[in-house]
C-alpha cells in the first residue's frame, strides 16, 4: 500500500557514477528522492581503472562541474596524481586525467549523499518495475518492499544478470564479490523494452612491494597546480603516487597463445558471445588481433590506503594460473603477487534508440535510463547521463520542457545524440573525433559554455553564477578592446623580432598581432593600459584571436543545422505509407522515430533523398510543425 514512508518523487536504482549524479540533481531541484544500491560500502565505486578524465572524458567531467554535478569536485578532493594530456597537440584535444584514491572517492560520495536534503540512501535490489497504463508508478525490491514514485531512473551498471568469467570458471555477479540483479531484466522485457548483452573486463591488481619499479618508465604527477573543478583551488600533489609505463614482450605473447584455448572468448567453447569495448580490448584480444611484438600498459596506484596496483592495459579473462604466468614474463613483474585476479563480466543493456533525448524511455512514461544500461562505458559518460537524467526527471515532474544539450554545446550533447540517434552495437566511448564541433567544446571553456544552465536549474548558487558571469563579461570586454587598440612599429618590432615574427611597417590593431601563432597577449600586455592578469582571461584572449576564423565557420554550420532542428517530425507518422523512401530507411525511422530533420540526417543509412521525400510528404499533409 502506498503511504508517506514508501512514496517518493524520484527513485534512482544504483549508486554508481550515474546514479549519484542523478539522485543529487533530483534532490537539489526539490524532488523527494530515494536512491537504492546493492552495497552501501561501494557507492561511486571505481571497479576498473582508478582514474577520472582523459581525452574527451576529462572535458565531460568539467561539463558536469559546470552544470552543478559533483564528479570533478570529488576527484579534486581525492586525487593522488594528475596530469594535463596532449599539451603538445591542438587545444581541442587537451584534457586532464587524474588518479583517484578509490576508497576516499567512494567514502566522500557516501558523505555527500547522506548529507543532501530531500535524499534518502537505502540498500535494495530492484526486482520489478511497476507500470500502470504505460506509466511508471514505482518498483519492487528483492526483499518484497514496494516503493512508489512519479519517476524511476535505472543506473544499473554491469549488474543486470551480471556474469563473471575467469577462464572456464563462471559465476553470477555484478562485480567480483557483489550480487547481481537478475530479476529486473525480465521486468523490462515484459514491459516491451529490447535488451541485449555486452561484456567488459578488468585487469589483475598486484601488490606494490612485489614490483621492481626500476624496470619501468615513471610518470609523475604534474609540476604545475591543476584541478578539474572550477570551484577547486588548483594544487600541486606530492610525488608519492606516480604511474609507470611498461610493455609486454614475445614471451608474454607466447604464454597468452598457450592458454588461449581456455579463454572464454577464444576457446573451443565460446562462453562469451557478447561484444566488448573496442577502445579497451583485453590483452588476449590485442595479441590475437594485432600483429605486434609488444603492447604497452600502465601501472597505476589505487589508493593511499592500499598497496594494490592496477595494471591498465592488461585486462584479461584467461585462467588465474595463466595470469600468474603472464606477469612472470615481464621484467619488473617476475615476482608480482596478484591480490585480485583479472576477469570479464557480461551484463544486460537496453539499446538507447528506445529513449528520448531527455533519457526517458519511449515505451514507459516516467522511466529514465542512464549509464552502462544505455550501452556506454566510462565513469564520465555515466555521470553525465545521470546528471541529465536527474535534471530531466525533476523537469518532467514540474511539467517543464526537457533539458537537451545540442551537439554544438557540449560533449554531453554529442553523447546523448549519438546514443539516441545511432544506437550502439558495441560499448560506446566518447572520443574527440565523435564531436564535429570539438574546437568549440574544449577543456578551457566548459564552464563558460554551460554555467547558465547549471544556475537555471538550481544546481549552481547565485554566487557561482555571478563569478562566472563576471569572467565571461571581462573576456568579451577585453576582446572588444583589443580590436580597437593600435600599436606602432616602434612599440612592437623588437618584440616581434625576438619571437621570430615579421615586423610591421605601420600601426596595426593589437588583435592583428595576436592572430599570429608565435605572439601571445603576455608578450604585448605592457602596451595595454587596462591589462588583465587573470590566467583564464589571458588564455581565452589568445585562443579567440588565433582560432576565431575557425570558430566563425563552425558557427555558420551550426546555424544551418539549427534550422533543420526547428523542423519537427510528428511522432505519430506512419512511415510505411510514404512512397519513395528506401525500405532500410523506413525500418530505421520506425525504430528510432527522429524528432527533427536534423536528427533524421544523423541516422546512419538515411540519405538526403529520403529526407527530401519525407519533407515533401509532410508538406503535402501539412504536418511540418
Swiss-Prot record:
Q: Which PROSITE patterns match?
A: GIDA_1, GIDA_2
Necessary cofactors: FAD
**Gene3D superfamilies hit by this protein:** FAD/NAD(P)-binding domain, GidA associated domain, C-terminal subdomain, tRNA uridine 5-carboxymethylaminomethyl modification enzyme MnmG/GidA
Annotated positions binding FAD:
14-19
Checking InterPro entries in the record gives: FAD/NAD-bd_sf (IPR036188), GIDA_C_N (IPR049312), MnmG (IPR004416), MnmG-rel (IPR002218), MnmG-rel_CS (IPR020595), MnmG_C (IPR026904), MnmG_C_subdom (IPR047001), MnmG_C_subdom_sf (IPR044920)
Gene Ontology cellular-component terms listed: cytosol
List S-S links within the chain: none
Q: Where in the cell is it found?
A: Cytoplasm
Role of this protein: NAD-binding protein involved in the addition of a carboxymethylaminomethyl (cmnm) group at the wobble position (U34) of certain tRNAs, forming tRNA-cmnm(5)s(2)U34.
Family listed? Belongs to the MnmG family.
What interactions and quaternary structure are annotated? Homodimer. Heterotetramer of two MnmE and two MnmG subunits.
Write the protein's name.
tRNA uridine 5-carboxymethylaminomethyl modification enzyme MnmG
